């Protein structure tokens, strides 16, 4: 494909036009009085949202140079979303401010490399100051405040707070679409996997069609059980203990399944057979998780173990197991705490190392099941458009809340960035490095300025007053009042604010040091000649 090139000022100005188009579409959403953006969807109803990264991902510009500029800011939003899960609009506003101010200085003759050094220096000091001003999230109310501010909805904050209280900070909280109008919270305690009983005759409660096992033994194996004789010695030991047994195997079939059902119906013993969860390597890993949680030994050929030789001390135990047609839930497994903690640490390491979003999601689910449970927030709304918008807001709020628990909180509404202004202004530098520091100083005020403008106020007036205010005191754009942001619960997670600033600075520095841009020339579709026809035909 043929390429076209642009150099120096021409290249940067073309990319700046793309930056501005994307940033201008995103920044109208920031703050409590921010607006929504409507996104056209080819095969479904339009999506109405105020989620920065969702808007940024939709933007594709016709001009290749402008599109490259837009893609750079998209990268800021994506990276911030990936690391912190929220703050994408703030990151976009910061990036635009740094790029615009930096480009003015480059055009005036400043050296981009010196500017980059100044930007890096200023951001390092700003991040250190943010951490100094950060406060730990201590209780349920503070967690609810973070969620409520992010979603602009107190009810959502409350749901997230309750969910985190029940499943722990490492617990999985999933967001699903509900068929009703109301949003609800449902918590599944213990380890649950999506496999049910292999025969309805195994149920203990025929009204609910549920098998409930109290203090059961748990057999965990990756083998297929076809012969009843293979497990008979083990079942005889279980019968003597007068306790039920849950059999988790690759499959229980034929003679083995028939005899388990017959003995259950005769009242000889209570046994429930379920298929092992997952597939392939993931199945082995999930069986190991279950074994560690319950204190069982996985009966597998990999370890040279055979079902005929299995003894009762190879079985796991739990306080309760509930099996439905579709799911099995193991509550309060009796596994060794140290082994469980070691497994949790191992999973956390794998989550950090993996580059696949799908693998990360599955690892997080496994971590949650070991750590305590799964909470499901079922989102309800009156229309599909409202449902999708509400779901996006809840996802952002959940990510914000997790970030707050991890690194603490700072004053919200852009106040935290202005609070570090003084520290950054004290940096001693000269020449282009000093100019780079000044670029960051101006950008630190950009989010507050935009929040004020979205509320119909003069941003410059708000910024100047905020610079002279006590640390933590800020402008509440929802009520047009000056308040102590932390006391009022108007907070941002430190991680979100930090990530937004760092990623914006990184992309701005790359932009300013760009001297040439190479783009593909779009191929023109030549009109196809008319097909020749028979005489007399058109």
From Swiss-Prot:
Q: Which EC number applies?
A: 5.6.1.7
Coiled coil ranges? none
Positions with a binding annotation for ATP: 29-32, 86-90, 413, 476-478, 492
Q: Where are the transmembrane segments?
A: none
GO BP, sorted A to Z:
protein refolding
Question: Where is it mainly found?
Answer: cytoplasm
Q: Which UniProt keywords apply?
A: ATP-binding, Chaperone, Cytoplasm, Isomerase, Nucleotide-binding
In terms of domain of life, where is this protein from?
Bacteria
Q: What class of enzyme is it?
A: isomerase
Any one cellular-component term (Gene Ontology): cytoplasm
- Give any GO molecular function from the UniProt entry: ATP binding
SUPFAM superfamilies in the cross-refs? GroEL apical domain-like (SSF52029), GroEL equatorial domain-like (SSF48592), GroEL-intermediate domain like (SSF54849)
Catalytic activity annotation? ATP + H2O + a folded polypeptide = ADP + phosphate + an unfolded polypeptide
UniProt cross-references to PANTHER family, sorted A to Z: 60 KDA HEAT SHOCK PROTEIN, MITOCHONDRIAL (PTHR45633)
> What assembly does the database describe for this protein?
Forms a cylinder of 14 subunits composed of two heptameric rings stacked back-to-back. Interacts with the co-chaperonin GroES.
What this chain does, per the entry, is described as: Together with its co-chaperonin GroES, plays an essential role in assisting protein folding. The GroEL-GroES system forms a nano-cage that allows encapsulation of the non-native substrate proteins and provides a physical environment optimized to promote and accelerate protein folding.
Q: Which NCBIfam families match?
A: GroEL, PRK00013.1, PRK12849.1, PRK12850.1, PRK12851.1
Q: Which family does it belong to?
A: Belongs to the chaperonin (HSP60) family.
Stated name of the protein: Chaperonin GroEL
């Amino acid at each position: 494909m043929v390429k076209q090139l642009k150099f120096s000022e021409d290249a940067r100005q073309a990319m700046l036009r793309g930056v501005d188009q994307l940033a201008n579409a995103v920044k109208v959403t920031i703050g409590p009085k921010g607006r929504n953006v409507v996104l056209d969807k080819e095969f479904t109803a339009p999506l109405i949202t105020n989620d920065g990264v969702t808007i940024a991902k939709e933007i594709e510009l016709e001009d290749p140079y402008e599109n490259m500029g837009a893609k750079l800011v998209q990268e800021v939003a994506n990276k911030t979303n990936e690391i912190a899960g929220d703050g994408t609009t703030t990151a976009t506003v910061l990036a635009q401010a740094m790029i615009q101010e930096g480009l003015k200085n480059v055009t005036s003759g400043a050296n981009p490399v010196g500017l980059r050094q100044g930007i890096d220096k200023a951001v390092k000091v700003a991040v250190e100051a943010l951490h100094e001003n950060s406060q730990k999230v201590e209780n349920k109310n503070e967690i609810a405040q973070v969620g409520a501010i992010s979603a602009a909805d107190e009810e959502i904050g409350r749901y997230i707070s309750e969910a985190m209280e029940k499943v722990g900070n490492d617990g999985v909280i999933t967001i699903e679409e509900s068929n009703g109008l109301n949003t609800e919270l449902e918590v599944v305690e213990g380890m649950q996997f999506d496999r049910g009983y292999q025969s309805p005759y195994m149920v203990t409660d025929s009204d609910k069609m549920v098998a409930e096992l109290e203090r059961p033994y748990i057999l965990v194996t990756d083998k297929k059980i076809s012969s009843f004789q293979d497990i008979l010695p083990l079942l005889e030991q279980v019968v003597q203990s007068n306790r039920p047994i849950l059999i988790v195997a690759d499959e229980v079939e034929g003679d083995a399944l028939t005899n388990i059902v017959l003995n259950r119906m005769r009242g000889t013993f209570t046994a429930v057979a379920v298929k092992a969860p997952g597939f392939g390597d993931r199945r082995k890993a999930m069986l190991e998780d279950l074994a560690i949680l319950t204190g069982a030994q996985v009966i597998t050929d990999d370890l040279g173990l055979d079902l005929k030789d299995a003894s009762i001390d190879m079985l796991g135990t739990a306080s309760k197991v509930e099996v439905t047609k579709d799911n099995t839930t193991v509550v309060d497994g009796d596994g060794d705490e140290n082994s469980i903690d070691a497994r949790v640490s191992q999973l956390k390491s794998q989550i950090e190392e993996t580059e696949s979003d799908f693998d990360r999601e599955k690892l997080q689910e496994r971590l949650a099941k070991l750590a305590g449970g799964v909470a499901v927030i079922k989102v309800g709304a009156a229309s599909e458009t409202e449902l999708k918008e509400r779901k996006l807001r809840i996802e952002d709020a959940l990510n914000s809340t997790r970030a707050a628990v991890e690194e603490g909180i700072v004053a919200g509404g852009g106040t935290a960035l202005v609070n570090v202004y003084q520290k950054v202004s004290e940096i001693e530098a000269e020449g282009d490095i000093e100019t780079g520091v000044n670029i960051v100083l101006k950008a630190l005020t950009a989010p507050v300025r935009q929040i004020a403008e979205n509320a119909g106020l003069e941003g410059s007036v708000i910024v100047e007053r905020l610079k002279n205010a006590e640390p933590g005191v800020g402008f509440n754009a929802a009520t047009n009042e000056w308040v102590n942001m932390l006391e009022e619960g108007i907070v941002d997670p430190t991680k979100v604010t930090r990530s937004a600033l760092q990623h914006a600075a990184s992309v701005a520095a790359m932009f300013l040091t760009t001297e040439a841009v190479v783009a593909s020339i779009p191929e023109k579709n030549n009109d196809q000649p008319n097909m020749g026809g028979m005489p007399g035909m058109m």
